[in-house]
């Protein structure tokens, strides 16, 4: 089933028993986090909170708290296991879009043309008088404090926008970028845009600042998009395909877009049926910036983007289960807020796994498998454990063909997708090891690994800025473990043979099992 907007999805979830309305008063300050966290850990439903005390907007939480709801958002109505299989089908679609196979026959050529036509047919379309602009706040009416922005953890620096789809465009680019970056509230119309240097929004901003020094950079933030658009923003979409176009493929209908209303921001388009849209700019710094507070990291310098207004962001509790360090990021000044009548505020929290991003990670793991297999046919399975923050550790199952093969796969995974540049640990095992069973993985490590021979250490590599274990912010080491059976050339010893029971004996005991009544 496909959903034209968030409300359509909410209605479907409620009919399936996958959404619960909470009528009791619940505060966005800490209480929503605690309630959503308990429900998520129990595998419970999405929660639609009545407008909290002193606020006019209901809050939607825990929307993608199970793999099934992620699959439902992508248009697949199935149980968790079947849903994960459907996500692999999605990965195969993405791998075909990323790197199409040369046709070997007229039939193959026809399939390739059909795929290209499907993508072309899903180009977004512009509409006028969109629902997302039914109500408009501008001038003195712009006040982000009127929104029920969550404060997630006791040590957080303040309220935090968590599910905002940030829309940007680089200079001379027709394709808009959608990214999800947390945004700290620091004033009635100001948010800190925490995008890391390698993310699409930050790259667009830096390119703009280089080519247009001193000019405000337009940004839009969408709160409460339809599920296909939201999930498109977190999926590894090929650079040649826009997230809006990919959302159309998921939905089976073209994404309807509306131009923003603010002059200068009207170069950007947002989902026409979004609940709330923030429009504004990142402005150049006026005058000399105030000195950094004592003990804070130095202000950014040395590039064109550093000449824009920045503020010290954090600390915040994040997906690692810790509070992160403070860092400087650009300030987004909101000049206009548009919304639907009776708008719904979509929110989440991040914390020690499992949390909603970890559940999304489990789902996206299935999307990654066909993408990796297209490039590395020897990979038979791939797993990003949620306990490893869904990206910091990868377990790879492979069909080994020669000595040193596992090490080749390690470096291949690290370099293949941007999503894996922050993966600190890779463990490679053979096909006989179930990589989703820690008992089997630990057995393989402890019986097939010699620490000196089978450990690969790589220093001075890109590392997540939130990883305080690295000696330098953003730069650290990686480790690979070759837990495969060793081939000639890798060992001079006779390699162990796994113990297996005789098949005839197992069949005999199967029959006895029933007779004995065990």
From Swiss-Prot:
EC supergroup of this enzyme: lyase
Membrane topology qualifier: Peripheral membrane protein
GO terms of molecular function: 3-octaprenyl-4-hydroxybenzoate carboxy-lyase activity; metal ion binding
UniProt-listed Pfam families: UbiD, UbiD_C, UbiD_N
Main localization category: membrane
Residues that bind Mn(2+): 177, 243
HAMAP family, A to Z: UbiD
Protein name as it appears in the record: 3-octaprenyl-4-hydroxybenzoate carboxy-lyase
Native source species: Burkholderia orbicola (strain AU 1054)
Higher taxonomy: Bacteria, Pseudomonadati, Pseudomonadota, Betaproteobacteria, Burkholderiales
Record gene name: ubiD
């Amino acid at each position: 089933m496909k959903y034209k907007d968030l409300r359509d999805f909410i209605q479907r979830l409620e009919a399936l028993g996958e959404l619960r309305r909470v009528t009791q008063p619940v505060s966005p300050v800490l209480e929503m986090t605690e309630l959503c966290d308990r429900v998520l850990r129990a595998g419970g439903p999405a929660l639609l909170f009545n407008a909290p005390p002193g606020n006019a907007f209901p809050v939607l939480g825990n929307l993608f708290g199970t793999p099934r709801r992620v699959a439902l958002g992508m248009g697949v109505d199935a149980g968790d296991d079947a849903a994960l299989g459907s996500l692999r089908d999605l990965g195969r679609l993405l791998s075909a879009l990323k790197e199409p196979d040369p046709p070997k026959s007229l039939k193959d050529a026809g399939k390739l043309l059909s795929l290209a036509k499907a993508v072309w047919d899903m180009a977004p379309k512009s509409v006028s008088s969109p629902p997302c602009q039914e109500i408009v706040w501008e001038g003195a009416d712009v006040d982000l404090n009127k929104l029920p922005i969550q404060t997630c953890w006791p040590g957080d620096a303040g309220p935090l926008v968590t599910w905002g789809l940030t829309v940007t465009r680089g200079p001379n680019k027709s394709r808009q970028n959608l990214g999800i970056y947390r945004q700290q509230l620091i004033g009635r119309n100001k948010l800190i845009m925490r995008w890391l240097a390698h993310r699409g929004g930050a790259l667009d901003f830096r390119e703009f600042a280089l080519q247009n020094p001193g000019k405000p950079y337009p940004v839009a933030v969408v709160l409460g998009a339809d599920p296909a658009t939201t999930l498109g923003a977190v999926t590894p979409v090929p650079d040649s395909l826009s997230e809006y176009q990919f959302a159309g493929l998921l939905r089976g209908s073209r994404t309807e877009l509306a131009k923003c209303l603010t002059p200068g921001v009207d170069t950007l388009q947002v989902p026409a049926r979004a609940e709330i849209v923030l429009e504004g700019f990142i402005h150049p710094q006026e005058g000399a910036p105030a000195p950094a507070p004592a003990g804070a990291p130095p202000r950014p310098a040395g590039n064109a983007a550093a000449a824009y207004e920045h503020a010290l962001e954090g600390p915040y509790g994040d997906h690692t289960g810790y509070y992160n360090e403070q860092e400087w990021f650009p300030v987004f000044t909101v000049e206009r807020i548009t919304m639907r009548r009776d708008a719904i505020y979509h929110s989440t929290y991040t914390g020690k796994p499992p949390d909603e991003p970890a559940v999304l990670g489990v789902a996206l793991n299935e999307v990654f498998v066909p993408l990796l297999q297209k490039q590395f046919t020897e990979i038979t399975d791939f797993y990003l454990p949620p306990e490893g923050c869904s990206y910091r550790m990868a377990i790879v199952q492979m069909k080994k063909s020669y000595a040193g093969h596992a090490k080749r796969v390690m470096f291949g995974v690290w370099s293949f997708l941007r999503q894996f540049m922050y993966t600190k640990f890779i463990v490679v095992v053979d096909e006989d090891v179930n990589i989703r069973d820690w008992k089997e993985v630990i057995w393989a490590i402890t019986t097939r690994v010699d620490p000196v021979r089978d450990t690969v250490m790589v220093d001075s590599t890109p590392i997540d800025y939130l990883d305080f274990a690295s000696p330098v912010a953003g730069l650290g080491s990686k480790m690979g473990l070759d837990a495969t059976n060793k081939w000639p050339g890798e060992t001079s010893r006779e390699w162990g043979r796994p113990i297996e029971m005789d098949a005839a004996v197992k069949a005999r005991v199967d029959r006895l099992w029933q007779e004995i009544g065990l």
